[in-house]
Amino acid sequence: MNDQHPHTPAQPSTSRRRVLSLAAAVGSFTALGGLPAFAATAPPKRPTTSPMLAEGQGSTTRMWYRAPAGENTMLERALPVGNGRLGALVGNDPSHELLFVSDATMWTGGINDVLDQDGQLPYGRTDFGSLTQLAHVTVDIPEHDLGSVNSYRRELDLAQGLVTSSYIRAGVSFERRVFASQPDDVIVVQFSQRGGGHYTGTVSLDGTHDETTSADGAHDSLSFGGQFTNGLRYGAAVTAHSMSGSVTTQGSKIVFTRCADLTVVISGGTNYSADAQAGYRDPDLDPAALARTKVRTAVRHSPTTLLHTHVADYRDQFDGMQISLGPSTAEQRALDTWERLKARTQQGEPDPEFEALYLQFGRYLMISSSRGSLPVALQGPWLDGNDPDWMGDYHTDINIQMNYWMADRTALSRNFDAFTDYCLSQLPVWTELTQSLFNDPRNRFRNSSGKIAGWTVAYSTNIYGGLGWWWHPSGNAWLCNTLWEHYEYTQDRQHLAKIYPLLQGACEFWETRLLTMTVTDADTGKEREVLVADKDWSPEHGPQDARGITYAQELVRDLFAHYREASALLGRNAAYSKTVAGLQERLYMPEVSPKTGWLQEWMSPDNLGETTHRHLSPLVGLFPGDRIRPDASPAALVKGATELLTARGMENFGWANAWRSLCWARLKHAENAYQLVITNLRPSVDGSNGSAMNLFDIYETGKGRGIFQIESNFGTPAAMIEMLLYSRPGHIELLPALPAAWARSGSVTGIGARSGFVVDLSWRDGKVREATVRSVGGRRTTVTAGGISHDVDLRSGESVTLRNFR
């Protein structure tokens, strides 16, 4: 994609009155309580007992390193912390602790309602906008230069949500902890020591948009505020406290002298509000003042209180899933994370504990980036500058969907809510932009019928309802299907009622878009009339004006089915549901090409695109959809999907490999699914495809340049779970694609299964030993493994333990 698309204003901007009326109609102001998480005021829940793991516990869920990250390698080497809204990359240099702080709502741009000359949407940092950094915080301790210390070690403790570093200097053991507390809404850096040492140095706070930092000597704090040209206000603050030594402000720095301990507290945010009626801003919120209040309030509590509050809150989510994929060797365990990553690739030996750690790292990132605020964007809240690739936006043709495939599968259903709330809050503007701009005569994707209703999106979306780059007609269906799948896991009727306006509007859009076409039935040779999607592009290759692309046909089929079921469950719109049923019955469904043997991507027997293209758009009916199933679909259809997946290849990058792995798991090809996971675990060197030192997934865009894209960090763990358990409504299959590397023994607790169940599972020698199925709203399902089935009938909260699968 290009960073800039020159455009000329060609039509009036979106009607503010229209947006307000649409916002009121869908009740979007309820989507985050009308306030950003930054403005939340609920008092933190303080634990009454220590939540800390005992010494020696959690050793398999620690990433560790022998050197800090440098200022120019933060994105690849720094360790991430986050509280769901506020995130930071932490460098851990003993003498120069550096934190790159970002806020998920720190966006330039706006509604972006003036089309380019080709009828598509502008996609630049000023019109569409971009996520940007909030601040840099530096703690300088000059005496502790790296050359004067020994036994240096830094860790990311996934089980407790802590970044720690330790070293010895002049016989004194020094340690620091960094964490992002959701209850206190702050980032905390705690310095301690054993052996009579002390800290002397300074704390600095610097904005990234030329702000001026001010000091408040009365509160030993620093802060700044600013405003973008789009009217969004932002601010940040930092304070420091010690129970010994001296802490003062001098100029624009906090100065600490001979402190045996030190606590640095950081907060910040914007006046963003997930409310279209308010223009996505809270006019009464002063972010700089609120940041100052938050750091001053937090620092009044003891370091232990802040630590325990964070760890108890974090573990409440993280402990929902424990996983073992088998034992690693003592030699593997002795390696630091980077050496272990390299050894896994160089030696080719399975490292089950490390592979399980990678899955848990994905869960850590989800807890840290999707909680009570906006959903996870392309990089989450972890930036190393103000110009992230693709604006750090939301891509609607795989990326945002993949970000949430893991959540319900890995005991993180609560973290899905940010995605739901986002879609609801954007719906009024999405609807207005669709109805006022989509049928522009210059838009090559416009509806041939001339009619328009409902809503859709573009390939890129921002946080103001704005759309960017090209129109993406099928994007509405894929967003809705992802929202629906969350209902399948949770059986949450409140969620279903919330998303119903999205489903309804998407169906209305497709009712105006589908075209009648006459085709010849491959089996009977007779002609019949079918409904096909209007001109579209199969992401992101091939012709840009093809009708009936498989991608659209599959997604719309599922959308219609989900809308009908939602209407029945909620007792709504029976008449329109019947209309949708009629449309669904007439939809053209893709065929296998007699020429290539592949499932057709276009209504053509020819391959009109790139054989090994990264996207698997024509396979959405295999994953994430359920239409193509090895155990229930026609053999020719399954073979056609398998042949297409084979042709796409096994050598790609990040999210493309993750999607391939998920598809191979669905086809029960365990070793192919596993190999793609391992391919994503190859070390990224000089920007090459693979995992960076900090396990962020890197996509190589050119020689020596790689981009962090977070979706693979979620999609790859989702594939690992799909290898252990497959579910669809009424059906659970255990160990459908267990690779040889994990077959010796293993266990996992907390796997989500569709129809409202959670499964704990253990196995030995490739066979299920025991499975406990618990209802979280589901009633009946069938559990199968190795050709043996058990029918389960439970009430919510009940569980049953199943054996006898051998």
Which residues make up each language-model segment?
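Aromatic-residue-lined binding/catalytic grooves and analogous aromatic/hydrophobic interfacial grooves
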Residues: 44-467, 485-487, 504, 553, ...
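Acidic/histidine-rich catalytic neighborhood
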Residues: 505, 509-566
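Well-ordered alpha-helical scaffold segments within catalytic/enzyme domains
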Residues: 365-367, 402-413, 478-492, 509, ...
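Short, glycine/acidic-rich hinge or "gate" loops at secondary-structure transitions
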Residues: 373-381, 498, 515-533, 572-576, ...
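Active-site neighborhood of glycoside hydrolase catalytic domains
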Residues: 483-486, 493-499, 528-530, 537, ...
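C-terminal region of N-terminal signal peptides and the immediate post-cleavage residues
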Residues: 32-45
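Non-catalytic carbohydrate-binding regions of carbohydrate-active enzymes
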Residues: 485-490, 494-495, 506-516, 577-609, ...
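N-terminal secretory signal peptides
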Residues: 1-14, 25-30, 41
